[in-house]
């Protein structure tokens, strides 16, 4: 009888066989599995040598809402690594992941990790040098984001292409050449280019195809490329409980809808994420409930156009779309066929069911702020008084070319209405400098809009034309790059002038702050948190009492709500003196009573 094959011999023999046969031989004759590596919070680490990591842990599977634990990866010794045979473990592969772009991409990665965990891929490592699977979740909004992705892909390709040499030199601790998977919007937009990039990438998976990732990775084992970028009219991942990336955080993201119907001329999102579809209210309430049990104190509701949320799944009689109320003076190219439960309905239910949890939302469109939503935000103490109002431009002519559905005047009137209903509201916005055909006069109108409104925060970028968009088909990107950058610098400077006044106005006030962790500038002596309006506040870590419970003094900890008197401001943060620990509802009840007493 012939002697049994070693794993190395199986690999050599497999080189002359089919990919399928070789794969089966390697799996059959591989030695016993090693202990699994633990998971870790995602970070983009350099390729420098890493210190010896602690012993490994495997992720628990005891419940869908349990977060991933965080620790370093297990180093692979020479005795554990057979350079000739490749894999020496039955593990499906350790995962390293990076995410670029918006909060929606962060939440998508949490969905991906949940899908992979349910298929047995339950090990996450903090650096790509220790991984057998590398996920890079991408953004296609601007060229700068895509260039960063290409740079990272070049490095990941180096880890894959030179795997044996990297392991021998101590630059890699992966058990086999890593599979590289590009996820997200860039995968949807540039799938052909990515796959043709000199065998750099193994898997390309669009935002609506994450359930297919385990199968796509298996295709790679058989020598095939794994690709699925099909868009869906139904997929919302409503039945999947995301695996939280930041497992020690008291804040979390919850996706309530996907896609966008607005078709703004500059935006690629409708082409990379598809049409709007909303999760059922019941599934959102369930997920928020699980987060509350896990200790989360603040939830950010996410969607590409979050306030156009429309759940038709739980409404027996759907109302005609003509009843869909837009902000006054705003229009939309998309006509709603049926109206179900709207965003105000969802926010109403969540805020009532979880009175000690704060709720934020992003990213909205100004057209979807009906009065009912504004009054709800005013009346609910746990709905944060920060409204994102992406203007994009202050020129009506530019807004028309952008197909935004409103004028400068309509936008300013909406701002005035919001502030009349919610006097202490904060506003944030998005702006694009150098859009197609933008003149100096139109740019100046944007600067005057920023001064007129006065924003707490803003996201400002130079225009980057995207293929497939209306602008790409119909306009010319005719503003020179140096002009775009100069206008962007002027826009940022103007914004800083106005926001400094807003932060200065907070000095002397008492703010409710959710403690989020140590201040990185002074981690031993200071903590940092966030106010209702999203302002960062630092304060000394000193023992304080509880306002209402009257227990003994103790220092604030992560997850506490505290009262802070603001004593100092800068252009991007506040600092103050901590007064006491408190609760969300009692703080606002107490301050509401004081306000009524002063008024009387």
Curated annotation (Swiss-Prot):
GO biological process annotation, one example: mitochondrial tRNA modification
The record describes the protein's role as: Potential regulator of CDK5 activity.
Q: Which cofactor does it need?
A: [4Fe-4S] cluster
Q: Would the keyword tRNA-binding be found if you checked this record's keyword annotation?
A: no
> What does the note accompanying the cofactor annotation read?
Binds 2 [4Fe-4S] clusters. One cluster is coordinated with 3 cysteines and an exchangeable S-adenosyl-L-methionine.
Superkingdom in the source lineage: Eukaryota
All residue ranges annotated as the Radical SAM core domain in the record: 246-501
All copies of the TRAM domain together span 504-580
Residue ranges of every copy of the MTTase N-terminal domain listed in the record:
93-222
Q: Which residues bind [4Fe-4S] cluster 2?
A: 260, 264, 267
Q: Where is this region: Disordered?
A: 45-66
Q: Could you name the Gene Ontology cellular component terms for this entry? A: cytosol; mitochondrion
**UniProt name for this protein:** CDK5RAP1-like protein
Protein's UniProt keywords contain 4Fe-4S:
yes
Known CDD domains for this protein?
A: Radical_SAM
Q: Which organism is it from?
A: Oryza sativa subsp. japonica (Rice)
For molecular function, the Gene Ontology terms on record are: 4 iron, 4 sulfur cluster binding; metal ion binding; N6-isopentenyladenosine methylthiotransferase activity
Q: Which family does it belong to?
A: Belongs to the methylthiotransferase family. MiaB subfamily.
Positions of [4Fe-4S] cluster 1 binding: 102, 139, 185
Entry's NCBIfam families?
miaB-methiolase, MiaB/RimO family radical SAM methylthiotransferase
Entry keyword set = 4Fe-4S, Iron, Iron-sulfur, Metal-binding, S-adenosyl-L-methionine
Which SMART domains does this chain map to? Elp3 (SM00729)
